Structures are given as C-alpha cells and as structure tokens.
C-alpha cells in the first residue's frame, strides 16, 4: 500500500455520541490513525427504527464516508452492525467492520451466563445471541431491549434519578438469571457503567465490544498493510444536525470540545 493510502482516515459512524466510546479506544490502541467521525444526530435513535430504515441510513452514510476517502469503515453502532453489516459489506471497496462478533467472542471467554443489554432493534435481531452461541454453544444468553437508555444519554441525563430507576428495571431480569457477564450491546451504554455496576453483583464482568472491535481493527490494518506510520491528522467530526449539542456532550465524554461540521444526508450524495 502507498503511504498516501495508509494515511487515509478510518471512518466511524453512529447515530450520536455512542460511537465516541469506539473513538476513545482508537485513540488508546491506535494513536497514529486519523479518524473521520460521523454522527447521524438528525435521525437518532436508531434502536427503534425499522430494518428498512436502518439499511437506507447505513447505505447513505457509508457511501458518503467512501466518497470522503476513508480506508476502512467501523460501524460504531450495534443496531447497524446487527441489521446491516452483512448486507452492505460486499457492496463497498473498503473493509467494513462491526461490533457484534468481536464483542461475542470476548464475552464467551469471560463467563457462562451472559446478559446483553441493547436497543430494541438489536435485541429483536438476536444478533448477539446467535454470535455468542456460535462462539460457544454451551453458554446461556439473555437479552434485554432498553429503549430509553440512548435518549437519556443523548439528553445528558446520566445523573438523573429516573435513569437509575430505568436501569434497575432493565437489569432486573438479568439479575434474576444470575448472569456472570454483561455485554454492552450499544456503544452508548458504557457511559452508564457507574449506575450499572451499582446495581449488579460485584462479580459480574463487563464486556465493552468497542475494546474488542479496535483489537480487530489493529489486526486487519496490519494484515492489509494499512497502518499509518506518519503523524495523524486531527479527528474530523461531522453530524447531520445539532452540532453545538454534540460538541458540548463530546467535551464531557472526550475531554475536549471538537469543531463539528454539519452535512445533510442524503443531499450530500447527489
């Protein structure tokens, strides 16, 4: 691969700030890589959308990312990974990676009674259940769809008593099943970790698929000779609406306030 190709950005997308958990992992594990982050804030949350809507959104976003010159695309959104990855990855000329298989492979190394909290769309797809049982058919899996988590996080209500109450309600079935491992089936959910840890037994192991995905990214970049060995470019942030709100939330979650551009999909594709 040419130096120019290796210096291209990795494209990441999510419906909102959830994918920043993947971005943080990229900064930690692959600090030399340049990133283009897209948040489809005009159409969030994805977790209550239909499969057809998700497929349309994902197709538009990846088309735009590829036109923007990325060398790889990361679906930093479990709903997209669950419903669209297999359908779109052969359509584009860049590698497209999702969260679910890396997360499932890590989960089965941790425990035998695995709970998955996810958006309703991800839970209904059974993508994590299938991936976990494919990795190890002897484990047990329980999934809970959590429709209110993403809106609460995007509205910056992490410390609201109502959020704690909702978390308690969602976790109750998993506590009753005595899970030993909890998988974040949505990239937004690591922001809830203090609340979730306070509700679950201390012995429960938390699995963040973002960590597992970035390990896979590192391996793929090496295999494909796409690792950047030059100084990385500053991360570019693009949203489909509410740039100020996104920047303010990013300050809390990343520790710095990014410059955020706004584009309108699908208008940008014409």
Swiss-Prot record:
Active site: 77 (proton donor/acceptor), 186 (proton donor/acceptor)
Family stated for the protein in its record: Belongs to the aspartate/glutamate racemases family.
Its EC number(s): 5.1.1.3
Residues holding substrate: 14-15, 46-47, 78-79, 187-188
Family annotation (PROSITE patterns): ASP_GLU_RACEMASE_2 (PS00924)
Organism of this sequence: Trichodesmium erythraeum (strain IMS101)
Catalysed reaction equations from the record: L-glutamate = D-glutamate
Gene responsible for this protein: murI
Protein name, as recorded: Glutamate racemase
Keyword Cell wall biogenesis/degradation belongs to the record: yes
GO molecular function: glutamate racemase activity
């Amino acid at each position: 691969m040419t130096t120019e190709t290796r210096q291209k950005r990795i494209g990441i997308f999510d419906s909102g700030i959830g994918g920043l958990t993947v971005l943080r992992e990229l900064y930690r594990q692959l600090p030399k890589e340049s990133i283009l982050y897209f948040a489809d804030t005009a159409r969030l949350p994805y977790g209550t959308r239909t499969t057809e809507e998700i497929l349309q959104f994902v197709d538009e976003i990846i088309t735009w990312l590829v036109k923007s010159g990325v060398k790889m695309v990361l679906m930093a959104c479990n709903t997209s990974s669950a419903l669209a990855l297999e359908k779109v990855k052969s359509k584009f000329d860049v590698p497209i990676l999702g969260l679910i298989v890396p997360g499932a492979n890590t989960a089965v190394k941790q425990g035998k009674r695995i709970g998955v909290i996810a958006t309703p769309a991800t839970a209904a797809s059974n993508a994590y259940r299938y991936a976990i049982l494919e990795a190890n058919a002897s484990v047990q899996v329980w999934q809970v769809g959590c429709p209110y988590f993403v809106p609460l996080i995007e509205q910056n209500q992490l410390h609201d008593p109502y959020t704690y109450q909702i978390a308690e309600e969602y976790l109750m079935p998993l506590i009753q099943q005595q899970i030993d491992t909890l998988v974040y089936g949505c990239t937004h959910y690591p922001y809830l970790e203090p609340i979730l840890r306070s509700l679950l037994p201390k012995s429960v192991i938390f699995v963040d698929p973002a960590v597992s995905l970035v390990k896979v990214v590192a391996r793929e970049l090496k295999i494909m000779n796409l690792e950047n060995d030059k100084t990385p470019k500053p991360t570019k942030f693009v949203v489909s609406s509410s740039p100020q709100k996104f920047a303010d939330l990013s300050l809390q979650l990343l520790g710095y306030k990014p410059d955020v551009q706004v584009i309108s999909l699908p208008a940008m594709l014409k």
